[in-house]
Each structure stands twice: as structure tokens, then as C-alpha cells.
Amino acid sequence: HPRRRLDDAERVIGEHPGLNTYQIAGMMQWKIRAKDWDDFPPGQKYFAMSETLAHLEHLLLEGRIQKEQAGDEAPVYLIK
């Protein structure tokens, strides 16, 4: 499961470079009964974003992605 999530986050970043954590989480595959990210209950979005952020940090430590931040903007992620 953790490896699948890491691969899924990396896939999203590869297909859509320059997204922030919220946007990446919204494009990942989740097993929840919601038709799309907008339909996720707020609590589930919070947990999904927390999990996504942990996976992004792991991918950063592995050197598979990079993080960029401009000023006060939310950081965005790119494939290395």
C-alpha cells in the first residue's frame, strides 16, 4: 500500500508538474465512495492531504521529486 501511494503521487507529478499538495491529493486514486475530489467529505480530504504530504516528503528524501516555492505561494512539486 505505501509503495502504491508513492508511485501514484509520482505518477500525478509526472503527468501534471507544478501542482501543490492539495492538487496532487485530488488527482491521486483513493478508495472512498465519492465521485470525485470535490465530493470528498472535508475530514477525508484532510487525511488524504496529510497522507499525500508524507508521501511527498518521502519522495523528496529518495530524490525522486523536487519541491519549489515562490514567495508565499504553496510549494509545488516536479519530477527530478
Please report, for each region that a protein language model flagged, where it lies by residue:
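Long, low-complexity, charged/polar intrinsically disordered regions in eukaryotic proteins
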Residues: 1-14
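C-terminal regulatory/interaction regions
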Residues: 11-80
